Each structure stands twice: as C-alpha cells, then as structure tokens.
Amino acid sequence: MSNHDPLTLKLSLREKCAYGVGDFGSNLMLCIGTLYLLKFYTDELGMPAYYGGIIFLVAKFFTAFTDMLTGVLLDSRRNIGAKGKFRPFILYASFPVALVATAQFFATHFTLPVKTAFATVLFMLFGLFYSLMNCSYGAMVPAITKNPHERAQLAAWRQGGATIGLLLCTVGFMPIQALFTRSPSLGYLIAAVIFSVCGLFSMWWCFSGVKERYIETVPDTHKPSILKSFCAIFRNPPLLVLCVANLCTLAAFNIKLAIQVYYTQYVLNDIHLLSWMGFFSMGCILIGVLLVPAAVKRFGKKQVYLGGLILWAVGDILNFIWGGTSFLFVIFSCIAFFGTAFVNSLNWALVPDTVDYGEWKTGIRAEGSVYTGYTFSRKISAALAGFLPGIMLTQIGYIPNIAQSDTTLLGLRQLIFLWPCGLAIIAALTMGFFYKLNEQRFAFIIEEIAQRKKTGNQIVATNNKQSISTVNN
C-alpha cells in the first residue's frame, strides 16, 4: 500500500504512456480481425458472408465466457509475486495472441466446411488468449490508482492508444496488402505479421512501464466463480447500466467499422478513400480523447458521455441524408467519430468506479469479477456486431467483386449509418435516466471505504441504512 493519499496520488507521464501503449498494441492485434477478417473470409477463402457472421457469433459468445473465467482466475490468486496480480498475464498471454492473430489470415485450400471449422477454431483461440491478456490489462486500473481524475487520465491514454492502433490498422493494413497484387492472400498474411509483431512489443512495453500499488486479494470466504461474476452485474446497478449502454455503443462502433470497407468500395466507388477517411476520422477521435480529462473535470463523466453520444447520432444522421459524396462522407464521419472518442474513453473510466461501488456495497473488492462481468457484455455486443453484418450483407444481396444493385447499396447505407445511430440513441437514454453514480457519490463511497479500513469495521454497506440513504438522496 502506498504511503500517499490514494485520492490525490499523481501518476507519472511515463506510466500513463506505458498504459496507453498497452491498448495500442492490443488494438493492433484485435482490429486487423475486426476490420478485415470478414472481407478475407468472403474474398479470399470464398465463404458466404453469413458464414463469417456465424463464426463471429459463435466465437464471441465463447470468449464472453472465457472473460468470465479470466475474472475467476484473477480473483482466485492468493500467492502474488513481484510481477503483481495482473501484469504477468499481459506478459505471457500476449505472445499467443500475436501468433493466432497472424494465423487467422492464413489462406487454406481445404473444402468449405473444413475452412469454416479451421477459421472458427482459430477465432475462438484468439478470443481465449485475448481474454487473458486484455481482461488483466483493463482490471488493473483500480490497482494502479484510486484517484478518480488519474483514472480518467488513464482511460484517456488507453483510448488514445487504442485510437492510434485503430488508425494505423485503417490506414496501413490494406495498402500493405495491396502491394501483393499477384497473391492477395499473401498480402493479408504479411500485413497481419507486421501488425501482430508491433502489437506484441507494445504489450511488453506496457508490462514493464506500469506499477500495481493497491494489490488486494479476495477474502478466503469468497469463492470466485462464473456465476458470481455474472451476478456481479445485477448486484451492482451502476455496472448494469454501464453494461447495457456499452452493449449498444460497442455494437454500433463495430458495425460501422465492419461495413466501412464495403461502403467505400461499392457506394463511393473509391476503396482508397478508406485510408483517408480513417486518417481524418481517427484523428478526430484522438483530438476528442485529448479533451476528455479537461471535459470531465469541468462537466463530469456522465454529462461528457451523453454529449459524445449526441454528437455521434447527429453525425450518422447527417451522413445518411447528405453523405453521398466522398468529401461529405469524411466530414460527417469525423463528427460521429469525434463523439465516439468521449463515449469509448469514458466506458473505461467508469468501470473502476463500479469496482469501488461494489466494494462499498458488499464489503468485497473483486476487480476481476466486476471487470469481466463488464467485458462479458462487451463480448456479447461484439458477437452481435460480428454476426449482423455478415447476415445483413447476405440479406441485402451482397456479392463480392461485382457492381452492387441499388437495393444492396441502400442496405449498406442503412447498416453503416442508421443502425449505429439508433443504438447510440438507446445508449444515451439508458445512461441519462438510470446511471446515478456521479462524482459526489463516488467521493462519499471512497471516503467511507477508507474509514472502514481504518477502524477495522467490515460492516457491509447494504446493511447500513444511514449510508444508503445518504448516497441515494
């Protein structure tokens, strides 16, 4: 335990940067699959689009439960060594993540059923190792700092790293692949190798640069389990609301990313626009991320979150109505992606607060269970986001590498704009009406937890009617 006041302890710039580099590396390995794996399946492996959707659905549901298992593993740890409670998983799981991320782009010449089975197994393996690495990375924040402003800073650095990783994937992957005109499938593989190796070294940088200061083990009387991780969502109202909102926002964001490569190629007839659009829109996200700490300090997390959702919805509506040219598409996309910067950053800043809420309410601090309960909702969202584009591409009549019909073009416009817009509006209504954990209540919770530890009082807060009345009124 640090001798500094946990609520005022400041982190070094070097440590914040190292933490941000972690999600940079994580996204380099994740986003090559999010952005291009469906297109690789359809165009190089010859799979029907709905096959890809089913693969994503099955594998993401599987990894939703591996996230839960990771939480159980983290909370079950008792003999914690010098590397800490979470950091060893970042170090050791990152190598198989990079290896499988690359292997997913290996073009086989088997029959379609064998190709499908092979792709499904690889995607599930990627999800398993990614759960071990990324859940540990995210659950580590409460162990790094208890200062809410520093948590917002870490969330901003994390989202900044993720944005730069996504930007590089958007701008750099297809140009590398396009260099191999005689063997497009080899181009996919080489690009995947480059991004995965960079991601691996970034995760190792993160491991070496961050410090766990507040390592607490779960009491022996509390036996972690998948059921308890799942129940942690429903026993923690702020976490439940955040999970529902995140279910909408992550699905919206991933649908947009999955469809944009089809939209630029077939609606705007300019596949090279994808790199420019990625450069400008991800640049807007990066600017938004840099503004998050100041905006949160002035307006509070909830208000900034809602403002980001409104910008997102407005940008998508404008794009659906007037985004028929490349220039307007980029402009309106920048508005929408600028809004997503605040939303995606604060998703991560709000989760550690719910960890403290859970400790205040139950007397048990279980970062792993809370965080993986949250990531369970994210994986369900990602499963739907991976499933829907593949199914919808089939429903609207998409056929690879030919001119698309007017019905198909309209379907692409609806998929990339109206679906994300609708989901953003649902998320805004959910957070606006049901999320109650503001800055004042959070400060009260932290103070009461500290007082309990000082006095050795282990009374569970749910039995303290006076405390509950103070927070809820």
Swiss-Prot record:
- State the protein's name: Putative sulfoquinovose importer
How does the UniProt record describe the way this protein sits in the membrane? Multi-pass membrane protein
Taxonomic lineage of the native organism: Bacteria, Pseudomonadati, Pseudomonadota, Gammaproteobacteria, Enterobacterales
Instruction: Please give the chief subcellular localization of this protein.
Output: membrane
Which chain regions cross the lipid bilayer?
Answer: 18-38, 45-65, 88-108, 110-130, 160-180, 187-207, 239-259, 276-296, 317-337, 380-400, 415-435
* PANTHER family found in the cross-reference section: MAJOR FACILITATOR SUPERFAMILY DOMAIN-CONTAINING PROTEIN (PTHR11328), SULFOQUINOVOSE IMPORTER-RELATED (PTHR11328:SF43)
Q: Which UniProt keywords apply?
A: Cell inner membrane, Cell membrane, Membrane, Symport, Transmembrane, Transmembrane helix, Transport
Protein function: Could be involved in sulfoquinovose import.
| Organism annotation | Salmonella typhimurium (strain LT2 / SGSC1412 / ATCC 700720)
Alphabetized Gene3D superfamilies for the sequence: MFS general substrate transporter like domains (1.20.1250.20)
